[in-house]
From Swiss-Prot:
Cellular component, GO, one term: cytosolic large ribosomal subunit
Taxonomy, superkingdom: Bacteria
Gene3D superfamilies: 3.30.160.810, Translation factors
Organism: Oleidesulfovibrio alaskensis (strain ATCC BAA-1058 / DSM 17464 / G20)
Keywords per UniProt: Ribonucleoprotein, Ribosomal protein, RNA-binding, rRNA-binding
Molecular function (Gene Ontology), one example: rRNA binding
Pfam families the record matches: Ribosomal_L3 (PF00297)
Function: One of the primary rRNA binding proteins, it binds directly near the 3'-end of the 23S rRNA, where it nucleates assembly of the 50S subunit.
GO terms for biological process, alphabetical: translation
Protein name: Large ribosomal subunit protein uL3
InterPro entries linked to this entry: Ribosomal_uL3, Ribosomal_uL3_bac/org-type, Transl_B-barrel_sf
């Protein structure tokens, strides 16, 4: 799906800043970029418009030969993370250009994609907010169980997407309409209003909306 331009970064953590009226605003600090353009794709040649960007320089011993050859064409060094961003229109950037936090302005709204914090194997009460079984009156060892998961003759199966216990978290999550409160270009920092997915130091993608 076509998107608008974005930049990779790391979630530093949360803090608060004070607005002009004295109110406290909770913000997430993201250290983003600079992200050099490694490859540019266009609809005529590749079937779609996109740019591939790199983030966080890597040592040569940590990059395999195919990736090394691919990144050498851009002449910007080797990177730990490569991400492709599909675009609606042909990219204005060229191979070797840097994408920085200057891409964004305070007040605009962005969407942030990250990997949610992994919680491991979780039961239905924690994972899906089930109410559980009664605490007493004849109920024994079923207090946190899900209850019935299906019927007998019909449908004779468990329905697809039935909410059950399982691995919780560690999934790609996108939060939309986050307002940029401040951009600190000298430190490559973006301050967005509210929380973003993932743990501290987690990889995130910040995109225009």
């Amino acid at each position: 799906m076509a998107e608008k331009m974005g930049i990779l970064g790391r979630k530093i953590g949360m803090t608060r800043i004070f607005a002009n009226d004295g109110s406290a605003v909770a913000v997430t600090v993201i250290q983003a970029g600079p992200c050099p353009v490694i490859q540019v794709k266009d609809a005529a040649k590749d079937g779609y418009n996109a740019v591939q960007i790199g983030f966080e320089e890597a040592k040569e011993k940590h990059v395999n030969k195919p990736a090394r050859g691919h990144m050498d064409k851009a002449g910007r060094g080797l990177f730990r993370v490569l991400r492709e961003i599909r675009l609606e229109a042909p990219a204005e950037q060229k191979v070797g250009d840097d994408l920085t936090v200057g891409l964004f302005t305070p007040g605009e709204f962005v969407k942030v994609t990250g990997t949610s914090i992994g919680k491991g194997f979780a039961g239905v009460m924690k994972r899906w907010n089930f109410g559980g079984m009664p605490a007493s009156h004849g109920h024994e060892a079923v207090h946190r169980s899900p209850g019935s998961i299906g019927h007998a003759t019909f449908p004779g199966k468990v329905w697809k997407n039935k909410k059950m216990a399982g691995h919780m978290g560690a999934r790609q999550v996108t939060v939309k309409s986050l307002q940029i409160i401040e951009v600190r270009a000298e430190d490559n920092l973006i301050l967005v209003k509210g929380p973003v997915p993932g743990p501290k130091n987690g990889l995130v993608m910040v995109r225009k909306q």
